[in-house]
Swiss-Prot record:
This is Sporulation protein kinase pit1. The lineage of its organism: Eukaryota, Fungi, Dikarya, Ascomycota, Taphrinomycotina. GO terms for cellular component: cell division site; cytoplasm; cytosol; nucleus. Protein kinase which is essential for spore formation. It comes from Schizosaccharomyces pombe (strain 972 / ATCC 24843) (Fission yeast). Residues 536-556 have a biased composition (Polar residues).
């Protein structure tokens, strides 16, 4: 049998031109079971499947075997496969998965024998649930990832598919630290190779802007950007840019990083910075990026995460690839250099609240969590709603049929909506009018996972400074609308609640979905009984969206939908004024305490709870509704100390 030798070079053969010292050979076998005891299948990918196996020696060492799906034309092609070629050209490194042997079976299928680690980074994140890693653990993981990337880039390669699934992890003996190794070099390319490259590059959530905008040239900065996305996910256990498609991915990036133009980035050093080439690439695709102000990563985290860690994210997640640091420079960043959170400048009260140095994040709804398995790039981790009512509501809000407007065509005149990014911070109010003058960007995708924007706005509410001069009602102790129609609605609902044995005090409650549909368009309020029942069933599932407080749980539902249908039809023919409808939306939501008693809060300021928005309209979430309701004199008020996620409308 002819032997095809292969080996791992001990020197940098890419730039020195020296030939590596070959020490091993590609071996033939009838079946891989002949050489190893295959235990079980542990993973399946685009190019191959991974199996857990043990050697047939007394020591029974555990290994991982990647069996390639594509058959080889001849044995010599084994070392020409991109993954094998990349691993052979890279010298052994403690943060790169080691390759032990290469076998070809009788069917000419290649089997790569590698070292086995306990799990990958995605599995680790999924098992942590609401138990985030400590600051020291995140530092250690990111430091090892940067070391592995530095080794890959120094040897003239870039990975192109950096994602949590391709980061292998094993716990050390003390269980507080991890051994991290980069794996899966099936998409790796040499830095000095010429384009065009293969079309499939990286998983969308970790894909750099130059890849999304179809730039013909890209290099190692795509790995740095992906590392920044993973750093956020390691710390918060949630992805930062969970896009449904490439267009939605760009929107979420603009939502957090801001638009890559000079006008939007006129806010200092925060954000993704300016990238002039982005507009050129977008025009080639026939799209126009939204105009949004960037967010400050320092505002998204509590001490000590808001300092060195936030600074690292802002440097890694730059629009312009040339402005991202190299892997070697990343190792010199303050976050990777410090071994303890000694750089955190915070008050004693803040330090006492964060003694375990964990990320301070709000509760994530169960509907926003990531499923247990995701093995392919195109497999969606989002389960969008298909409700007929929500589709009508989408159409009523934006009226768009395409995710982006064409840059060369004049769009129809529409009302300018406030950018979510500008509502986020009062610092951006001065430039909000200038950067939101373009056509309102499409509504956020259905049931999107939480992003930093959702996390921050979860501790905020929308409040209106509109003063009510209407007389107080004796029974309800709240302002009543002035129109005869709304008075009739209140009387009808009062009669229904007084007849209810479970209600001790009368309170008007209407479906929040019905109220909002009335606010948008009278035609949308004429719904079938089936659609209303479907919407009511969504509200009945409220317990799984807000389990934080057992003493105060909001309840949003409609009373006797059949009896209300006639009133809704009459409203469609002669709707009241816009402000009167807003009063109906604000004042028909009640508060239910732990004993089941329904009471209506009396408060001069009108507010819409973030929990109400998240629960009753998962299609839009907080971020979209905040800009679409266009309440008079609306502003963002910080009530994070009062846990407004469990409060309801007065």
């Amino acid at each position: 049998m002819k032997k095809y030798l292969w080996g791992t070079p001990t020197t940098n053969t890419v730039f020195t031109g020296k030939q590596p010292k070959y020490t091993k050979e590609v071996r033939k076998c009838i079946s891989i079971d002949e050489v190893y005891n295959v235990v079980r299948k542990v993973g399946d990918g685009t190019f191959g499947s991974v199996y857990l196996a043990t050697t047939k020696t007394p020591s029974k060492e555990v290994v991982a075997i990647k069996s390639m799906k594509k058959k080889l034309a001849k044995v010599s092609d084994a070392t020409r496969l991109r993954e094998v070629h990349s691993l052979l050209r890279l010298s052994e490194n403690e943060n790169i998965v080691n390759i032990f042997d290469l076998y070809i079976d009788q069917f000419r299928c290649l089997h790569i024998v590698m070292e086995f680690l306990d799990c990958n980074l995605y599995q680790l994140i999924s098992t942590r649930k609401n138990d985030p890693l400590t600051l020291e653990q995140v530092q250690d993981i990111m430091r090892q990832i940067f070391k592995g990337l530095n080794h890959i880039h120094t040897n003239g390669f870039f990975h192109r598919d950096m994602k949590p699934e391709n980061i292998l992890i094993s716990s050390n003996s003390d269980s507080s630290s991890f051994n991290v190794k980069i794996a899966d070099f099936g998409l790796a390319r040499e830095i000095n190779s010429r384009p065009p490259y293969t079309e499939y590059v990286s998983t969308r959530w970790y894909r750099a802007p130059e890849l999304l905008l179809r730039d013909s040239y890209y290099s190692f900065p795509v790995d740095i950007y992906a590392a920044g996305c993973m750093a956020f996910e390691i710390a918060t256990l949630q992805p930062i840019f969970p896009g449904n498609d490439d267009f939605d991915q760009l929107y979420k990036m603009c939502e957090i990083l801001g638009s890559p133009d000079e006008q939007s980035q006129n806010t200092g050093d925060k954000g993704g910075g300016i990238w002039d080439r982005a507009e050129l690439l977008a025009n080639k695709l026939g799209i126009s990026l939204p105009k949004m102000a960037p967010l400050d990563f320092g505002d998204l985290f509590s001490p000590p995460w808001n300092l060195a860690f936030a600074s690292m994210l802002s440097q890694l997640l730059k629009w312009d690839p040339a402005k991202r640091p190299t892997a070697e420079m990343c190792l010199d960043l303050e976050f990777c250099r410090v071994s303890a959170p000694a750089d955190a400048v915070a008050s004693k009260e803040e330090v006492n609240k964060n003694t375990d140095f964990r990320v301070s994040i709000s509760y994530f709804p169960s509907s926003s969590s990531i499923p247990d398995e995701c093995n392919t790039e195109e497999e969606s981790r989002i389960n969008p709603s298909t409700s007929k009512f929500l589709k009508q509501l989408n159409k009523g809000f934006n009226g768009f049929t395409k995710p982006f407007r064409k840059s060369r065509k004049q769009s129809k005149n529409r009302k300018n909506k406030s950018s979510v990014a500008t509502q986020f911070s009062e610092e951006s109010e001065d430039i909000a009018d200038s950067i939101t003058s373009s056509t309102f960007f499409p509504v956020l995708p259905q049931i999107r996972p939480s992003t930093p924007l959702n996390l921050k706005l979860r501790n905020f509410i929308i409040s209106s400074s509109e003063d009510s001069t209407s007389p107080k009602a004796k029974e309800f102790d709240r302002p009543l609308p002035s129109t005869e129609f709304l008075v009739a609605i209140n009387k009808s609902q009062e009669a229904l609640l007084n007849n209810s044995p479970n209600s001790k005090s009368g309170s008007t409650q209407l479906s929040a979905s019905t109220c909002l549909s009335d606010l948008i368009s009278p035609q949308l309020s004429i719904l079938s009984h089936e659609d209303k029942r479907e919407n009511q069933s969504v509200n009945s599932e409220s317990s799984k969206y807000s389990p934080r407080s057992s003493n105060h749980s909001p309840t949003l539902h409609s009373k006797d939908l059949h009896r209300d249908m006639a009133t809704v039809n009459n409203y469609a023919k002669s709707p009241p004024s816009f402000h009167a409808t807003q009063d109906l939306l604000r004042k028909t939501l009640a508060y239910t305490n732990s004993s089941g008693t329904s009471t209506v809060l009396s408060n001069d300021s009108s507010a819409i709870s973030s929990t109400f928005l998240d629960r009753d309209f998962p299609d839009f979430g907080i971020t979209s509704l905040a800009g679409s309701l266009t309440l008079p004199d609306s502003k963002i008020i910080d009530r994070s100390k009062t846990h407004v996620s469990t409060q309801l409308l007065p």
